[in-house]
Curated annotation (Swiss-Prot):
The keyword Magnesium does not apply. Keywords: ATP-binding, Cytoplasm, Fatty acid biosynthesis, Fatty acid metabolism, Lipid biosynthesis, Lipid metabolism, Nucleotide-binding, Transferase. The gene is accA. Acetyl-CoA carboxylase is a heterohexamer composed of biotin carboxyl carrier protein (AccB), biotin carboxylase (AccC) and two subunits each of ACCase subunit alpha (AccA) and ACCase subunit beta (AccD). Component of the acetyl coenzyme A carboxylase (ACC) complex. First, biotin carboxylase catalyzes the carboxylation of biotin on its carrier protein (BCCP) and then the CO(2) group is transferred by the carboxyltransferase to acetyl-CoA to form malonyl-CoA. The lineage of its organism: Bacteria, Pseudomonadati, Pseudomonadota, Gammaproteobacteria, Enterobacterales. Belongs to the AccA family. This is Acetyl-coenzyme A carboxylase carboxyl transferase subunit alpha. It comes from Cronobacter sakazakii (strain ATCC BAA-894). Residues 35-296 form the CoA carboxyltransferase C-terminal domain. NCBIfam families: accA (TIGR00513), AccA_sub (NF041504), PRK05724.1 (NF004344). It is an enzyme of class 2 (transferase).
Length: 319
């Protein structure tokens, strides 16, 4: 897969282009007198070193760009790489099947779990079909239906958050977007099974929270979680979306800051260069964290689970 490089990664992109060019020449003419392999090896080491240097000092705006990277793994990628026997379930049993939310039963290390997550889509047709990962009310009602099913069958719930926000269209509002989100918040706080939520890309406002109330909340290293996008915040405060980098720094949208505020439990490290560079390694790290979280929650009784979740919610904010 050819990598897409972001603006701040251009020095890395230039090195990788040289590597690709030399590799292509080597394949075309194996009788060259110069030792291309040594030069390719040297450039690859230099690329890794440069990547480490750049990624050691990323700002919030750069992390926001990584969270939106078009090649970043989505929910169904992690389902394929970290789970077994996934059976997708569709529809809210009231209006429609919203493709921006995917869900179903799978096995995590042999254990049945319910998976629910946002799905953005990659190619143009799929992006449109999945509404760019922005759910309508029927998507959140589908998610709630699956959560209630998981509770009936005593299955843990695992959610993956990756959305710019709930769909703000007229039709969505007419069908009760705010009610659907609010109902999910209330019902998720009452579920009598373990709920583990992980932000894998963008955690955009109420659209993220509607599947984000859990006993454990994790974030991938280069994901974001916020009440509004940096561009939206900048447009309100400075009347210009060009101030988005400044807004991103001020908003505290990145995982280390949110962990410091005790809004999340864990930051899951990503492979060098981001999750899209090595989805398999990222999926394995995610799986390890999910299994550890389940082990922590399995020892709690249902009453203790609910009480712990209530105390968690009540602890949010400044005293």
């Amino acid at each position: 897969m050819s990598l897409n490089f972001l603006d701040f990664e251009q020095p890395i992109a230039e090195l990788e282009a040289k590597i690709d060019s030399l590799t292509a020449v080597s394949r075309q003419d194996e009788k060259l007198d110069i030792n291309i392999d040594e030069e390719v090896h040297r450039l690859r080491e230099k690329s890794v070193e440069l990547t480490r240097k750049i990624f050691a000092d990323l700002g919030a705006w750069q992390i926001a760009q990584l969270a939106r990277h078009p090649q970043r793994p989505y929910t169904l990628d992690y389902v394929r790489l970290a789970f077994d026997e996934f059976d997708e379930l569709a529809g809210d049993r009231a209006y429609a099947d919203d493709k921006a939310i995917v869900g179903g039963i799978a096995r995590l290390d042999g254990r049945p779990v319910m998976i629910i997550g946002h799905q953005k889509g990659r190619e143009t047709k799929e992006k449109i079909r999945r509404n760019f990962g922005m759910p309508a009310p029927e998507g959140y009602r589908k998610a709630l239906r699956l959560m209630e099913m998981a509770e009936r069958f005593n299955m843990p719930i695992i959610t993956f958050i990756d959305t710019p926000g709930a769909y703000p269209g007229v039709g969505a509002e007419e069908r009760g977007q705010s009610e659907a989100i609010a109902r999910n918040l209330r019902e998720m706080s009452r579920l009598k099974v373990p709920v583990i939520c992980t932000v894998i890309g963008e955690g955009g406002s109420g659209g993220a929270l509607a599947i984000g109330v859990g006993d454990k909340v994790n974030m991938l290293q280069y994901s974001t979680y916020s009440v509004i996008s940096p561009e939206g915040c900048a447009s309100i405060l400075w009347k210009s979306a060009d101030k988005a980098p400044l807004a991103a720094e001020a908003m505290g949208i990145i995982a280390p800051r949110l962990k410091e505020l005790k809004l999340i439990d864990s930051v899951i490290p990503e492979p060098l260069g981001g999750a899209h560079r090595n989805p398999e390694a990222m999926a394995q790290s995610l799986k390890t964290q999910l299994l550890a979280d389940l082990a922590d929650l399995d020892v709690l009784s249902k009453d203790d689970l609910l009480n712990r979740r209530y105390q968690r919610l009540m602890s949010y904010g400044y005293a």
